[in-house]
C-alpha cells in the first residue's frame, strides 16, 4: 500500500466527515424507463473541468444514498462520502444515481422482496440512463468507466452487465468493469449469468444477509475474480459504526431472525485498498 493510499484510508475510516469537503454537483439523469433521477457528481480537485478522466458509477444499496438521522441527515451517508473522497483523491470522478427518491422511496431494506415496488429492472434501467448521460459529457473518458455497487446496488451491477440481456450486449458505451460489494448472487446463478465485462466481487465471510456462497459459485462458473474477507459481515466496509443485529430486515439467510451488518475496522480498509489496486490494474 502506498503512503498516499494509507493517508486517505486513515482519513476516510476514522474521520470521514472532517476529511470530506468536495463540491457536489447535482444533476438530473433520465432512466431508460423515463423516470427522472437525481444524481450527485464529484470530480477530482486536481483536474481541469474539461480534462477526460475515469468515472465510477456508484450504485447505492437498499438503504439509499443518504444519511437518515443526525446532523448529516439528507447528505451522502458515511460509506458514500468516504468512497467519494477516496475516488476523487485518486483521480476518478464519481457519479451517484439516486434510484429511490423520485420514485417515492428512501429505503427498501425492511420490505420483503415480493412487496417492493422498485425492482432490479428499474435500477438497471437507471444504469443504462447514467451511461447514456455520460456519453454526452466531454470530461468522461468513455474507455474508463466502472460500475461500483453495494448489496442491492451490487445485484443491480450484475444485471447491468449480463450479456444475456440484449441491451447490455448492444450498448454503445460499455463499462470497462464492474466491482461489487456483497451482492445477492442467487438470481444471477439461477439465470445462467454471463458477464459482458470483467467482474470483481468483495464478499464478507460471515454475511447472513447476502451470503458469499452463491457469489463464489457464480465467480467460479464465469471466471470472475472475488475476495472473501474473514470475520466480516454485510456492510463491513462502512467507515463508521459497529456490527449490530437488524431485526427489521425480513430477507436473509434466516428469515424472521434479522441480519448482522456493520464495520470491520481491519477488512474494510483492506477491501477499499483492493478496490484501488483493481482499478489501477484494469487500465494498466
Regions found by a protein language model. Name each.
Residues 206-210, 234-235:
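Acidic catalytic loop of the alpha/beta-hydrolase fold
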Residues 210-220, 241:
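Short alpha-helix in the alpha/beta-hydrolase fold that links the catalytic acid
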